[in-house]
């Protein structure tokens, strides 16, 4: 088969090329210079991630975003999610420098695996063909398994990696089986947009493939009931790895969910919207209720991430322009407030050796900066105004009200109120309680290598958590623009709102702007 190289439109993958080159450079520098140059590896990774982010900007206005014979689409939707993934990877690098030095872990391999996971997540965000989707998903998954077990001398890390691998392999098998059904039912098509018209009249067989594909995607989202791996993996894995999995991997999963559902299953929108309504409610309820009983900060944030996935799924479940726009905005704000919280946990655990919630008691007396960062990030996760998390949830609930999805709004509001308890409990401990033994023995290592990069990351995430709340109106316009410029999402302007499916309410005819 003759392939026109110009038709490949390979320039749309420049950010991915740069991440790949950075990965190779990190390997070569470590191979040639060894430990002498290990200090430079995180900064090389940061440089590469920064350049890759900069190369995304011109892609916002690409005339032809389709590349590699339809396997990859660099539309504005993928540009936004790839930017989220690159930013989360860069912030993970900032928080990992001191952590790796103090934990005596191999430096080069960590950044190579992190860049590999970043590459897989970016490719997954723009993939529009099933073979490409599976390859990108496995690249992200395999590097994530290795990262979760990176502290190989730690039994908890080994256990976390094994659980993640076994459950992840099962979910990949389920996802692949769902795609194989699609391949057969569509007469051998692998392009998502080509599959849709060929399965629209199939009925139950197509619904079976839909359920299997959704199950595989929901594993990446940590959505209930596919969440069992999350608490153990979050508790046992190195904290910087957990931070990336909670944001970068999840962002790629949501990008895949939007593209797969709107491109391959537009004729089954009522069915998959109803499915995601149930998953969103289960995730919000279980995540927030179980988080209340946690005594470990990392396990609490694990269940918090399950609940946060439920909130984001509100936008996916209602299936309108406003819903997808609110998803994008909430993921963007969640990126900074969640990574900021994990950075604070990293710094505290490095100085005390524990992540128990009670150990944070009286922290304000010893470290006001750390207390401020963690408090603002937790309050933003709780949805307290005027922080970014409040406006993100407000826009999600507003989009649900516009679609008359009152059941989702009810559960979202009730669980948000419940979440305030376990977030504010930590803030109260730090501010008004007597110092714990760990805080009394707290050692500030301000002159240690890597602490300043960690503090810089904490400052960036905290400022973003506050400022994004102030800049929310222009961000809404940006998200709406990205959706209007994405061809595969044009049909959702007149999509049936979820309320007509779940409550039987009369829905407005058009939610387009």
Swiss-Prot record:
Residue spans with biased composition (Polar residues)?
A: 494-505
User: What is a GO molecular function of this protein?
Assistant: NADH dehydrogenase (ubiquinone) activity
Tell me where it resides.
Answer: Cell inner membrane
Which Gene Ontology terms describe the biological processes this protein takes part in? ATP synthesis coupled electron transport; photosynthesis, light reaction
Q: What's one Pfam family the UniProt record gives for this protein? A: Ndh2_N
Q: What is its main location?
A: membrane
* Segments for region (Disordered): 494-513
Q: Catalysed reaction(s)? A: a plastoquinone + NADH + (n+1) H(+)(in) = a plastoquinol + NAD(+) + n H(+)(out); a plastoquinone + NADPH + (n+1) H(+)(in) = a plastoquinol + NADP(+) + n H(+)(out)
Q: Where is the signal peptide?
A: none
Sorted alphabetically, the Gene Ontology cellular component annotations on this record are:
plasma membrane
What are the alphabetically sorted keywords of the record?
Cell inner membrane, Cell membrane, Membrane, NAD, NADP, Plastoquinone, Quinone, Translocase, Transmembrane, Transmembrane helix, Transport
InterPro entries listed in its UniProt record: NADH-Q_OxRdtase_suN/2, ND/Mrp_TM, Ndh2_N
Q: Which family does it belong to?
A: Belongs to the complex I subunit 2 family.
Q: What does it do?
A: NDH-1 shuttles electrons from an unknown electron donor, via FMN and iron-sulfur (Fe-S) centers, to quinones in the respiratory and/or the photosynthetic chain. The immediate electron acceptor for the enzyme in this species is believed to be plastoquinone. Couples the redox reaction to proton translocation, and thus conserves the redox energy in a proton gradient. Cyanobacterial NDH-1 also plays a role in inorganic carbon-concentration.
Q: How does it assemble?
A: NDH-1 can be composed of about 15 different subunits; different subcomplexes with different compositions have been identified which probably have different functions.
User: What name does UniProt use for this protein?
Assistant: NAD(P)H-quinone oxidoreductase subunit 2
Query: What lineage does the source organism belong to?
Result: Bacteria, Bacillati, Cyanobacteriota, Cyanophyceae, Gloeobacterales
Q: Which gene encodes it?
A: ndhB
